[in-house]
Amino acid sequence: MFTESSIGTVQSYQELGIPVYTELASASIDQSLDNIVEDVRNIGEIFNVQETANAYADELQERIDALMDKVSSQSGEPLKVLFMAGYADGTFVAFNSKMSSCMLNALNAENVLDKGGNGLTLENLVSMNPDIIVYVRADRFGATDADAVEQLTSNAVVQEVPAIANQKVIEMDYDDVMDYGARVIDSAETLYNSCDSAS
């Protein structure tokens, strides 16, 4: 993110006397849910609100630990998850990111795609055969998102896809699942409930 061709390097800001904090929960490095907690603590220290930040970080850590305890009691093959967006007229967009992959790994699940893609079709969806579909609502797809899931799940072509057949299509907002903040933990808890009932 911090490159000369985009917003400038960290060094260039520092040379101007502008302090820079680069989040651990970042698209630039491999991820862990614990990075979110550490960012909260670090930002609390930067803004001199350590007590409030540490209390919030402790709460987040407790939720992560509780979630990991639940996951550790389960066994079986990882469930296949598809992050889908922009469904319209039989085509869709698929997402993958380091944080979403980290979240899935923590839940004993995996993204059906190594990387995202545009212009995917229902035939692609059938081939992916996901156990769970996370339909990601986004502002840029606002015109079609309102009835996208209904249109998808009623299409005859995909009725044997496990996520459709077992009614495992979850709707989430883009920021809740694709960004790198505390809301990812909310999404992980929501997704765990679907994974638990799908396994």
Stretches found by the model and what they are:
Residues 7, 26-52, 61-73, 78:
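A conserved helix-loop-strand patch within extracytoplasmic ligand-binding domains
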Residues 1-27, 66-178:
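Binding-cleft/active-site segments that stabilize strongly anionic ligands or cofactors
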